[in-house]
């Protein structure tokens, strides 16, 4: 059940990332790595207002990052992110 919820959240996150309008400016189209570019945080929360077993501590706040180079310690690879034509690794903890 937890796996199903996690996968559903990741699918919804992927749809949201693809649906966001992309604004191309000169700064955004540079392929050079900018400071802090590896740490694009995405926060995902689970649960309903009345409370359920899904609101356990491990599922309450799932924080994901789109990283250029592999995941850091305590993070797991959960898929890919796309910003424009560039692909990133989706790392969650």
UniProtKB/Swiss-Prot annotation:
Q: Does the keyword Disulfide bond apply?
A: yes
Would you name any one GO CC term? extracellular space
Spell out the Pfam families in the cross-references. Defensin_1 (PF00323), Defensin_propep (PF00879)
Answer whether the UniProt record assigns the keyword Iron to this protein.
no
* Region Disordered, residue ranges: 22-56
Subcellular location(s): the record lists:
Secreted
Tissue expression, as annotated, is: Paneth cells of the small bowel.
**What is the superkingdom listed in this entry's lineage?**
Eukaryota
Q: Where does this protein chiefly localize?
A: secreted
Prosegment residue ranges: 17-58
Q: Which cysteines are joined by disulfide bonds?
A: 64-92, 66-81, 71-91
Could you list this entry's UniProt keywords, alphabetically sorted. Answer: Antibiotic, Antimicrobial, Defensin, Disulfide bond, Secreted, Signal
Signal sequence, start to end:
1-16
Swiss-Prot/TrEMBL GO biological process terms: cellular response to lipopolysaccharide; defense response to bacterium; defense response to Gram-negative bacterium; defense response to Gram-positive bacterium; response to xenobiotic stimulus
Record-linked InterPro entries: Alpha-defensin, Alpha-defensin_C, Alpha-defensin_N, Beta/alpha-defensin_C
Mind telling me which PANTHER family this protein's record contains? ALPHA-DEFENSIN 1, ALPHA-DEFENSIN 1-RELATED
Q: What does this protein do?
A: Probably contributes to the antimicrobial barrier function of the small bowel mucosa.
Q: What is this protein called?
A: Alpha-defensin 3
Q: Which organism is it from?
A: Mus musculus (Mouse)
